[in-house]
Amino acid sequence: MKKTILASAAAMCCAVIAQAQTSQQNGASQTITVTAQKRLEDVRQVPLSVTAISGDALQDAHISNFADLASSVPNLSFSAASGAGAGLSTLQIRGISSQAGSATVAVYLDDVSLTTRNLYSQGTAEPRFFDVERVEVLRGPQGTLYGASALGGTLKFISKQPNLRSSEGCALAEVSSTSRGGVNYNLQGVINVPLSQDTLALRVGVQSGKDSGTIDRVDVKTLKVTEHDINDAKWDVLKLGLKAQFNKQWSLTPALFYQRYRSGDIDAAYEAVGDYQSASVGAKLAPFQTSKIVREPGKDVLAVPSATLEGDLGFADLTGVLSGYHRKFDRVQDGTSINSVYIGSVVTDPVLGAKVGFLPSAVQLKNKVNQSAFELRLASKGYEVGKSPLTWIAGVYAARTKTEVFDNEPVFGINAAFKAAGKNIDDPDQLADAFPGAFKNDSSYYSARHYNDRQTSVFGEITYHISNNLRAIVGLRSLRATQHFMREGDFYYAGGPSSVVIDSSASASTPRFALSWDMDKQTSLYLNVAKGFRLGSANRPVPLTTLVKADLKDMGLPQTIPEAYLPDSLWSYEIGSKSRLLGGQLALNVAAFYIDWSNIQQDVVLPNAGFDFETNVGKARSVGFEFDARLRVTDQVTLLGSGSVANATFSSDMPALGSDGNGALNVRKGDRIQGVPRFNASLGIEVGVGNNGFVRASGQWVGASVGSFVRDSSDHVRPGYFTASVAAGMSLAKWEFTAFVKNLSNNQQVIQRPDVQGVSTVYHLRPRTVGATVSTTF
């Protein structure tokens, strides 16, 4: 069952401080280049709202995951499905939030798309922020250049490339300690070696680390701690890049990104013993404790090979990218509350039913994604005064993706329990809805889902330079997609063996129109209008069991599950400015937007049955603005600030999302979209000390948001919160030493209370972390 869990709270807002350090080192007039429009250009020339954070800034700010990034980028938020943890998260930009259907934010590792559908069993792939040149966050729909699922925007990881001219390297060691947890560490090293001067170079990077857990597991009967820090996480990363420069015009760069991430459990605690667990039902637990019956570990492995061919044709630059994206994500959930408890409640013998209700049950999920893609694009040379007023980019894209989800849910010991009681587990008079073979090998449910997707598209943009300081852009992408879906199911909750095959297809066009005006050398204004689009898909079949029917009735929904859900789309209207004022001492970027979203893909959760399905529910709009500013007060003092507002609301009643016990709709016109903080603000300062030292401090406030659309849910309103961090350090020759504190006040506030697999859980801010970093370059 998919649950929406806002998890952006896990991070500190140091990133802007680290950017200040970079600016101080490089000078106030530093030019920031980005590839937002698939060509390298000055960010001021891009008529989009873009945040670019350098690799050095990411390292200085200890940004290593989506949660950390969300804390420092205006109008970027972060949620998770089925519990908080790596591989479960999804991103939202400008209030375009949906845990159903395809992702609303496209994620790219260089030119390789890591974007896949949202599933109850997994979230977006999350590469570590390691050996990157920069990270770019492109706000607003990017469908013209980045295709379907760039509905709210795009996140790009830009890797550092092999250096053909000189050997270089770097190393870093970080150790820290987390309150209520233990020791954390991160070790990494990168080396670049020219194998042949100016023609062939190899770049290798490795990283290994651990974050300590903070949650203790207690015995459900004695309430004594049996395991400490169960939610620890470990990771290993390997990056390889080989660049061959054949001549001045042509080069080939094969690359590989490999990551293995293992977690001992999700970051969920309980406030009280669940009502299914023991005679201690309702007993209060201490903060950061859980009484779960079954541990919930996970293992997420990513492999991203690619080969990029670049050629200078004289009149234009050719880029061809052949890539793969392979992911295997295995995880376990505690299914006792939705499997054992329900089965026990429909056993006619109350003594046996009570025993069955306490049997441990696991939801064993295995996810596989295998994608191959190819993109070929041709980009004209940059604009030069006195030459052609037109610049352009055109390309083709093709991808084939196979996604498989295997779900096995055993109730351990159920056959033995019936046998010991002298009962027949296949008899519907002794167990409601039973049939022969319903619990083979103790499994209560099995499902195998296979999605085979194919997508082709052509795209292009033309920029007409009306004058030296006025530009107009027109772009269009035309997309065609097909899907073959097959699902196999069996055992008790599936109603016996079943098989479903659904074929579907879709097409879309996503235009873009933009106007950019350089008022003077310091300020540029822009207008951008763009369309975003998401593909639809088949729903996983949901058996109409007694519990499913009861949930549908209680929610005021029809007694049927839709076979599929349709595409959705939006139009975005944005105006903004980018300024360098006070002689370059003040950098100020401001943008305002209005988004109209229709036919929204949304998730409908059946709370007691343990199933969910996707459907299209209506319309929404998101209105807001964002800004970021950097002021270099003196050579030694820099101030930074950023903020955003996103008023994302449904613009019509949503009967498809059900009603409460009194018949009132769960979601009505004007209700806020889930998982979107209305306000977000950060403020930071960096002070240089002498020639080699620095002190940084930053703070962030995240506003309240809506968790569950069910009004009487404990997670309906998620409170706002404030966090702060500090760091100090110094440089000696090629060495840098830093001490830091994240969550300075040790704020352990409960920021959400979602229901996960039928259990009410709580999520805390990660406690204070104190650490030190040593790094060097050579």
Residue ranges with predicted function:
Residues T35, A67, S71-V112, E133:
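Extracytoplasmic beta-strand/coil segments of soluble accessory domains associated
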Residues A379-K381, W392-G395, N468, A587, ...:
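Gram-negative outer-membrane beta-barrel transporters
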Residues F66-L69, T90-R94, T104, Y108-D110, ...:
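N-terminal periplasmic accessory domains that precede
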